[in-house]
Amino acid sequence: TFESNMMGTLNMLEAVRACPDVGAVVMITSDKCYRNDEWVWGYRETDHLGGYDPYSASKGCAEIIAHSYFKSFFGDPVNAPYCATTRAGNVIGGGDWAADRIVPDCARSWAAGQPVQIRSPWATRPWQLVLEPLSGYLWLGARLLLGLNEPFNLRSQAYNFGPAADVNNTVAEVVEALAMHWPGFNSEMDKAGQAGMKECTLLKLCCDKALACLNWRATLD
């Protein structure tokens, strides 16, 4: 985890430094990069980075590394590359069959007639279809590449991309919604599965900056 998220970020940025043809860089980390204080409101881009588990800590480290490079090497207001980081919520979408993903895990478990293991059924997450943050990444990258930096400074900034704060759902609610489309399968949840893993309960993102600077908002339910 640390090697991928920290050293991977560092290696990529070093490659950008060595390539004069790069015009813009949009780095994607995670909403888990924030120090989670179990707030009921959404985290803003200026809130503390950190993490109480290795994954979250590694994402916070990736953000710190990225912004140190932005300020040290990519801060020229005239010359490219122009850079930014993005922090997206929990994405759902086709093509993701990895382990420890809520939709693929449900599909595999129910197809086998087994209850799906849920680590934190009452935890809330900023769920969104993968096309939502992708649209934000592409729009941000296009504006950086074209030098569209007015009226807000987009360069060397961080942006949250997530759903509206009032549509955050619990893991259990997502599983129950999926079960409605799987008649005949075992929709029981094994709520003791992997209970020893450290996970935060409340997680929301404030995406006001993306709305103000990029005119971006989530549009899908």
Where would I find each of the regions flagged by the language model?
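Short beta-strand/turn micro-motifs at beta-sheet edges
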Residues: 38-40, 75-76, 106, 144-150
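Amphipathic alpha-helical segments in well-structured domains
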Residues: 5, 9, 99-104, 137, ...
